[in-house]
């Protein structure tokens, strides 16, 4: 199980990304289509003023059962350990153990 502080930090990041997403996209589009260098530099300074944790790249995929960040399978939303456990217990429909 992941530490509670890490999970809370991740929730905080998700909220910040959701809150500043439209403003960040608008600034990026303005920078992309700006004509002068001075206008571009002013827009970039505005973009830098936004919180760092409001960037989507800062989010981390985590297992929804254990909260582990490593060994994450996107299709299931689980870490590798929980995927194996739940697969053996037949808790994931359509998942079968491979044998050849």
Swiss-Prot record:
GO biological process: translation
Main location class: plastid
Pfam families: Ribosomal_S14
Xref: Gene3D superfamilies: 1.10.287.1480
Record's keyword terms, sorted: Chloroplast, Plastid, Ribonucleoprotein, Ribosomal protein, RNA-binding, rRNA-binding
Domain of life: Eukaryota
Compartment(s) of residence: Plastid, Chloroplast
Assigned GO CC terms: chloroplast; small ribosomal subunit
Disulphide bridges, residue numbers: none
GO molecular function: rRNA binding; structural constituent of ribosome
Role: Binds 16S rRNA, required for the assembly of 30S particles.
UniProt subunit comment: Part of the 30S ribosomal subunit.
Similarity comment text for this entry: Belongs to the universal ribosomal protein uS14 family.
Name of the protein this chain belongs to: Small ribosomal subunit protein uS14c
Upper lineage: Eukaryota, Sar, Rhizaria, Cercozoa, Chlorarachniophyceae
């Amino acid at each position: 199980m992941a530490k509670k502080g890490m999970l809370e930090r991740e929730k905080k990041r998700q909220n910040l990304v959701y809150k500043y997403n439209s403003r960040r996209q608008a600034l990026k589009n303005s920078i992309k289509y700006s004509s002068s260098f001075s206008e571009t530099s002013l827009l970039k300074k505005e973009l830098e003023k936004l919180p760092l944790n409001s960037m989507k790249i800062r989010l981390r995929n985590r297992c929804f059962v254990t909260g582990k960040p490593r060994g994450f399978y996107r299709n299931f939303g689980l870490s590798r350990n929980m995927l194996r456990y739940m697969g053996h217990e037949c808790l994931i429909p359509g998942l079968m153990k491979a044998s050849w």
